[in-house]
């Protein structure tokens, strides 16, 4: 059966939206799945629901949570199997969780912050390769995107899905679900709460309002926001 490019089962095929998981959750509960994955149409962002084995409930992971789960797993496995390079780097966007900082500190690698947009992570990878000033280990942004290798310069939900499934299998051998692996990370690195508020401005009026806001920011750029 060929996929339908119109995505008729959802009004908005976005892995950040709960409605995109309605059919997946229904099937997941039926077959008792450990995790449920969904990507966006171009397969660069990954949404995840994981099962709580004690309650049977499925919990949604934010992009920060899934990114940290994958990043911690990738880095820990590399450390165990071949050791970490002295100049190893974990790259994140400036709006991503500070748990990434704690993970980098725990493994003794550098934490590199870049501007919002995965292209800046890609640029940093290129800089590492050309200048020899770092070894890329993992990169993530809070908007459900990450990259586990240097084969690409953009986020990739296909390999992220594979890696998260591998992590789930690894933790299952230790009698842990991904949900409890996440809780274990909170206990090790500290508790971090994040929330994303999306504001949609529709139509021509919405576009005009957006342009007005952006023009105001460019012409009268604030020196601080919220006291920072």
Where are these regions (language model features)?
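Short low-complexity, flexible loop/linker segments enriched in glycine and/or proline
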Residues: 8-13, 52, 126-130
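Phosphate-binding and adjacent anionic-ligand microenvironments
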Residues: 29, 33-35, 39, 57-59, ...
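Short Gly/Thr/Asp-enriched flexible loops that form oxyanion-binding sites at enzyme active sites
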Residues: 44-64, 100
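Short gly/pro/ser/thr-enriched loop/turn and capping motifs at secondary-structure boundaries
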Residues: 2-5, 45, 66-69, 118-122
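Catalytic or ion-translocation cores adjacent to nucleophile or general acid/base/metal-coordination motifs
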Residues: 62-74
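Well-ordered alpha-helical segments embedded in enzymatic catalytic cores
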Residues: 19-23, 70, 120
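A short, conserved beta-to-alpha structural element at the edge of catalytic cores
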Residues: 2, 9, 67, 76-80
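N-terminal small/polar loop signature for handling phosphorylated ligands or for N-terminal nucleophile
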Residues: 1-45
């Amino acid at each position: 059966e060929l996929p339908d490019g119109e995505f008729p089962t959802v009004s908005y095929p976005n892995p950040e939206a709960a409605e995109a998981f309605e059919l997946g959750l229904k099937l997941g509960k039926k077959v008792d799945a450990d995790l449920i994955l969904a990507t966006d149409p171009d397969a660069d962002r990954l949404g995840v629901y994981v099962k709580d084995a004690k309650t049977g409930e499925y919990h949604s992971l934010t992009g920060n949570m899934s990114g940290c789960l994958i990043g911690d797993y990738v880095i820990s496995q590399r450390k165990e199997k071949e050791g970490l390079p002295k100049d190893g780097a974990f790259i994140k966007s400036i709006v991503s969780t500070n748990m990434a900082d704690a993970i980098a500190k725990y493994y003794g690698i550098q934490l590199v912050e870049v501007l919002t947009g995965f292209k800046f992570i890609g640029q940093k990878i290129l800089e590492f390769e050309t200048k020899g000033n770092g070894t890329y280990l993992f990169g993530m942004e809070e908007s459900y995107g990450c990259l586990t290798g240097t084969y690409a310069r953009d986020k990739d939900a296909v390999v992220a899905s594979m890696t998260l499934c591998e992590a789930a299998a690894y933790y299952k051998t230790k009698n842990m679900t991904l949900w409890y692996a996440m809780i274990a990370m909170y206990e090790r690195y500290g508790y971090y709460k994040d929330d994303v508020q999306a504001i949609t401005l529709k139509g021509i009026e919405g576009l005009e309002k957006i342009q007005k806001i952006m023009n105001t920011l460019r012409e009268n750029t604030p020196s601080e926001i919220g006291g920072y």
